[in-house]
Amino acid sequence: MAVSRRRVPQAGARSFFCALLLSFSQFTGSDGTGGDAAAPGAAGTQAELPHRRFEYKYSFKGPHLVQSDGTVPFWAHAGNAIPSADQIRIAPSLKSQRGSVWTKAKAAFENWEVEVTFRVTGRGRIGADGLAIWYTENQGLDGPVFGSADTWNGVGIFFDSFDNDGKKNNPAIVVIGNNGQINYDHQNDGATQALASCQRDFRNKPYPVRAKITYYQKTLTVMINNGFTPDKNDYEFCAKVENMVIPTQGHFGISAATGGLADDHDVLSFLTFQLTEPGKEPPTAEKDISEKEKEKYQEEFEHFQQELDKKKEEFQKGHPDLQGQPADDIFESIGDRELRQVFEGQNRIHLEIKQLNRQLDMILDEQRRYVSSLTEEISRRGAGTPGQPGQVSQQELDTVVKSQQEILRQVNEVKNSMSETVRLVSGIQHPGSAGVYETTQHFMDIKEHLHVVKRDIDSLAQRSMPSNEKPKCPDLPPFPSCLSTIHFVIFVVVQTVLFVGYIMYRTQQEAAAKKFF
């Protein structure tokens, strides 16, 4: 690998585009079309995308979110939830608060997708407790599980911000299913019940965090926009659960709770879409809207249209100088058109590379699950009684594990190369005076500096070892002579005699001194 890396700067732009084409070819089929990692249940080509239909009765979005009586149309809120014109504060930043909002009507969608935009903000570095997005058979208006009821029948996607088990794996996003008979393991953050999870920090972000949850062909996929950029479509893969069975009819909901620590949990929008598989006839909106509602909506539309026409006339009367703008200002120039086309092309390349990055994340997640399952199988068989004729299957499992690890390594290398490609494309999107020649010259300078450092190290090594002679240890100093036994005994006897004589002399002096008193 070291040889190929030194040749990359010399190849210049040609090697870069060859690597880009090779990376694209690894993830395309025989017909030249690639899969869509962001699409729900993407197993085919991009042409086989499901039909999306917006369901307004299972959605809310600001502005003008609440009615005059403080309620949200088609939704019911409970607990400490506070609806406002632009958002719904599910749980305020006070201790021991919990609230929730739920759809009033049950949804009977075979496949669906929800897009939730929310903010979790707090003053401290650690927050609590978190927020949950639900699809359950019944409404859980109040309860101990992030403000909702326990033993639910359905699925919950938990945005857990507090580390209850002390494993330092929070904030985390956890997918937990329930059949209505299991109590949530709150002390361990549901680690033993999690179907899938990922670690993402969703607190105190500069932009709202977005979650896209897709249930398509019995596969639940969670995509996250971490809120670092204003791009609404900048999603990354988080979790995926296959062969998941949920109730055919259920309520959508979102809940939140606080504990000793408290965050503000605000939901800006909750958009629901019904998905229809390709080849099937999409549902028509006329079947759901009655004639009275149609007439009512038509009257409202005509009323708003008349008000708009009046506002236009008033604006034109108040601003006569803005009428009759030159036609040249309306159309773009040739330079503007060319610049727009260049940026659009570069943006498409950037989006394709990000799509490949998402697909690599999904492949890595699947490979990790396969490796973990095989490792558990190996450990379970290894814990059995020895001497059984199962060594052949053990070797096969070891071979499969090694091959899976090799695949993971190769996928990581491809991902790293794609990240480098994204960096180079980002550099191309900012054109300046530096070209391909200057970039190549920069790499050549780095290579030359590395050679100089290596030469200096070699010279230092040769200078420290001028010959092949082995290093000798220094000679030991002369051992000091010890005192003999006779001298030691004489010294002790003399010292004892002197001590006894001193005691006797002192006693006589004290006795003589007492005669004078």
Swiss-Prot record:
<dbReference type="GO" id="GO:0005794">
    <property type="term" value="C:Golgi apparatus"/>
</dbReference>
<dbReference type="Pfam" id="PF03388">
    <property type="entry name" value="Lectin_leg-like"/>
</dbReference>
<dbReference type="GO" id="GO:0001701">
    <property type="term" value="P:in utero embryonic development"/>
</dbReference>
<dbReference type="GO" id="GO:0030017">
    <property type="term" value="C:sarcomere"/>
</dbReference>
<feature type="binding site">
    <location>
        <position position="186"/>
    </location>
    <ligand>
        <name>a carbohydrate</name>
    </ligand>
</feature>
<feature type="short sequence motif" description="ER export motif">
    <location>
        <begin position="516"/>
        <end position="517"/>
    </location>
</feature>
<feature type="disulfide bond">
    <location>
        <begin position="198"/>
        <end position="238"/>
    </location>
</feature>
<keyword id="KW-0812">Transmembrane</keyword>
<dbReference type="GO" id="GO:0007029">
    <property type="term" value="P:endoplasmic reticulum organization"/>
</dbReference>
<dbReference type="GO" id="GO:0005789">
    <property type="term" value="C:endoplasmic reticulum membrane"/>
</dbReference>
<feature type="binding site">
    <location>
        <position position="164"/>
    </location>
    <ligand>
        <name>a carbohydrate</name>
    </ligand>
</feature>
<dbReference type="InterPro" id="IPR051136">
    <property type="entry name" value="Intracellular_Lectin-GPT"/>
</dbReference>
<feature type="transmembrane region" description="Helical">
    <location>
        <begin position="485"/>
        <end position="505"/>
    </location>
</feature>
<dbReference type="GO" id="GO:0010638">
    <property type="term" value="P:positive regulation of organelle organization"/>
</dbReference>
<dbReference type="GO" id="GO:0010467">
    <property type="term" value="P:gene expression"/>
</dbReference>
<keyword id="KW-0479">Metal-binding</keyword>
<feature type="region of interest" description="Mediates interaction with RAB3GAP1, RAB3GAP2 and UBXN6">
    <location>
        <begin position="506"/>
        <end position="517"/>
    </location>
</feature>
<keyword id="KW-0472">Membrane</keyword>
<dbReference type="InterPro" id="IPR013320">
    <property type="entry name" value="ConA-like_dom_sf"/>
</dbReference>
<keyword id="KW-0732">Signal</keyword>
<dbReference type="GO" id="GO:0030246">
    <property type="term" value="F:carbohydrate binding"/>
</dbReference>
<comment type="subunit">
    <text>Exists both as a covalent disulfide-linked homohexamer, and a complex of three disulfide-linked dimers non-covalently kept together. Interacts with MCFD2. May interact with TMEM115. Interacts with RAB3GAP1 and RAB3GAP2. Interacts with UBXN6. Interacts with SERPINA1/alpha1-antitrypsin. Interacts with BET1.</text>
</comment>
<keyword id="KW-0653">Protein transport</keyword>
<comment type="function">
    <text>Mannose-specific lectin. May recognize sugar residues of glycoproteins, glycolipids, or glycosylphosphatidyl inositol anchors and may be involved in the sorting or recycling of proteins, lipids, or both. The LMAN1-MCFD2 complex forms a specific cargo receptor for the ER-to-Golgi transport of selected proteins.</text>
</comment>
<dbReference type="GO" id="GO:0005793">
    <property type="term" value="C:endoplasmic reticulum-Golgi intermediate compartment"/>
</dbReference>
<feature type="site" description="Required for ER export">
    <location>
        <position position="508"/>
    </location>
</feature>
<feature type="domain" description="L-type lectin-like">
    <location>
        <begin position="52"/>
        <end position="275"/>
    </location>
</feature>
<dbReference type="GO" id="GO:0000139">
    <property type="term" value="C:Golgi membrane"/>
</dbReference>
<keyword id="KW-0430">Lectin</keyword>
<dbReference type="GO" id="GO:0062023">
    <property type="term" value="C:collagen-containing extracellular matrix"/>
</dbReference>
<feature type="binding site">
    <location>
        <begin position="259"/>
        <end position="261"/>
    </location>
    <ligand>
        <name>a carbohydrate</name>
    </ligand>
</feature>
<protein>
    <recommendedName>
        <fullName>Protein ERGIC-53</fullName>
    </recommendedName>
</protein>
<keyword id="KW-0813">Transport</keyword>
<feature type="modified residue" description="Phosphoserine">
    <location>
        <position position="433"/>
    </location>
</feature>
<keyword id="KW-0597">Phosphoprotein</keyword>
<feature type="binding site">
    <location>
        <position position="162"/>
    </location>
    <ligand>
        <name>Ca(2+)</name>
    </ligand>
</feature>
<dbReference type="GO" id="GO:0033116">
    <property type="term" value="C:endoplasmic reticulum-Golgi intermediate compartment membrane"/>
</dbReference>
<feature type="topological domain" description="Lumenal">
    <location>
        <begin position="31"/>
        <end position="484"/>
    </location>
</feature>
<keyword id="KW-1015">Disulfide bond</keyword>
<feature type="binding site">
    <location>
        <position position="129"/>
    </location>
    <ligand>
        <name>a carbohydrate</name>
    </ligand>
</feature>
<feature type="binding site">
    <location>
        <position position="160"/>
    </location>
    <ligand>
        <name>Ca(2+)</name>
    </ligand>
</feature>
<dbReference type="GO" id="GO:0046872">
    <property type="term" value="F:metal ion binding"/>
</dbReference>
